[in-house]
């Protein structure tokens, strides 16, 4: 789903857009959801249109959810010669340990992400010097994501066709891994351009200066030993 708005006049033009997307996988354990936002603006600040200001914003947020083994579940199902021999249930109807369905229920691997970009630029075409222009721009990018990966023994399954109790659950096999990542990039650019034609000859020259400040940091933590799979949390 996408909604956009475009408009403006002779000296000012703008475009904005808001989009939403949701996709489900072959199993309800897989899903992807994303929201996008865009805002672009161009403005001529002087009546002779020699000074142009550009301002752009765009960002998105997304949620990517999948089981603990991720795509590996179906890679095994498609390429492993043993998987077709393991139906979802035993001959007695009991849910079978090690089946594709069982591997979809041994945890989760979820990632929440945010990304934002901003660009502002000012370009001046010098009126009294043909072909000469100067431009300054500032670009800012930041992103953040939080990953939670919880893995545990398969639940609600049976080791053999005649088992009288579900497969045992070992709390020590349950582990939770979380990671937080932040990234920022600030870029400043100043540029002078000169383009001129003299008869059959063309002359082009450019002077450019660029400066960047980059920052990134991440933190991760892991814990094992969960007596229940209902609400795994880290004690930080």
Predicted regions and their residues:
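His/Asp/Glu-rich mid-to-C-terminal helical/loop segments that flank catalytic regions of hydrolases
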Residues: 124-126
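A short beta-strand motif that forms part of the nucleic acid-binding face
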Residues: 19-20, 59
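A generic beta-sheet turn/junction motif
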Residues: 7-11, 20, 196-200
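Short glycine-rich, acidic/polar surface loops and turns
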Residues: 2-6
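Surface-exposed loop/interface segments of Gram-negative outer-membrane beta-barrel transport/assembly proteins
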Residues: 1, 25-36, 40-117, 133-236
């Amino acid at each position: 789903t996408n909604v956009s708005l475009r408009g403006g006049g002779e000296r000012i033009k703008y475009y904005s857009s808001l989009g939403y997307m949701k996709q489900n996988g072959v199993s309800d354990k897989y899903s992807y959801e994303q929201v996008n936002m865009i805002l672009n603006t161009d403005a001529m600040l002087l009546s002779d249109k020699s000074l142009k200001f550009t301002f752009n914003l765009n960002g998105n947020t997304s949620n990517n959810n999948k089981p603990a083994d991720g795509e590996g579940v179906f890679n095994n199902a498609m390429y492993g010669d043993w998987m077709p021999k393991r139906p979802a249930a035993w001959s007695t109807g009991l849910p079978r340990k090690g089946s594709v369905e069982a591997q979809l229920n041994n945890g989760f691997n979820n990632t929440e992400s945010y990304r934002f970009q901003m660009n502002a630029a000012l370009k001046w075409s010098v009126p009294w010097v043909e072909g000469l222009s100067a431009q300054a721009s500032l670009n800012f990018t930041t992103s953040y994501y939080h990953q939670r990966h919880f893995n545990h023994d398969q639940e609600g399954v049976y080791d053999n066709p005649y088992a009288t109790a579900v497969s045992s659950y070992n709390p020590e096999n349950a582990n939770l891994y979380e990671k937080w990542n932040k990234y920022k990039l600030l870029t400043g650019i100043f540029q002078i351009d000169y383009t001129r034609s003299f008869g059959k000859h063309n002359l082009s020259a450019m002077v450019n200066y660029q400066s960047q400040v980059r920052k990134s940091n991440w933190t991760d933590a892991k814990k094992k030993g969960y007596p229940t799979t209902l609400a795994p949390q880290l004690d930080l």
